[in-house]
Amino acid sequence: MRGYGALVLAPLVLVACSGGGGSPGGEGKSASATGSARAEPGARTSEKPDDTGVIDADPARLPTSPEEALDLIGRVIAEPATFGPGVVKRSPYESDPATWPVLGTDCIWRQQKPASSVLATLSRSFEVPAAGGKGPMRLSAVVTVHRTRDDARWEMAESVEETMRCPTQQLRQGELIGSMIASSLGQEKGVMDSAEDFLLESGEYQNAELGGGPYPYSWYLSQSLQFTVAVTGKGAKGWSQQEIDVLANQAHSTMLLRLGAAVEKQS
């Protein structure tokens, strides 16, 4: 998976990885969606300006510099209301754009400098505060702008590889995700009309500060053009997988719509 060569993303029907789970909660995989240390691409495939995939993009509206990429991210990335009522900012709210999470060979996530294929990336953290006998549900949203579409596709491929390589992953001290199931649905009807590829992971989340767990965990990642959009939901006491997915899906879908509006051709 680390060699670049000609990259073909055949839809992955289902990959089930048994893992122990642990105690995750903060950002790790959830914040950066995929941040594994990647081999730098050797020969890049040149892309035609009009080769814009599902979104009918205007080449002039596609970012080509870090500054343009951060500006676009600011117009696309979720805020609390994007998820729905009751969701608030969590501190720290935004990540440092100069870093992103990288999954090491020891299956521990650490902050490192983004790969050279990344123009800009940003994550935001949210939560539904504890109330009514339920613990705090933690949410995150991430938007990454790559230099090329192939770079974004490579992120999707790496995400599947990471789940298979590390069925249990440490997000930070006392936080783990495990028992992961990953499903890549490609462009199947009804998934995400504006996404070229879509990956859903679900599993178990453990957090020592929240009583251990395991609790439900969901992670949505989609790719369109040179962009990837991700949302993570981490449960706590009293939260069901379905409740987490409702909020995560709402934010993920909204960001995809915003992305299309930001780069598509204008009549």
Language-model region placement:
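N-terminal export and membrane-targeting signals
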Residues: 1-10
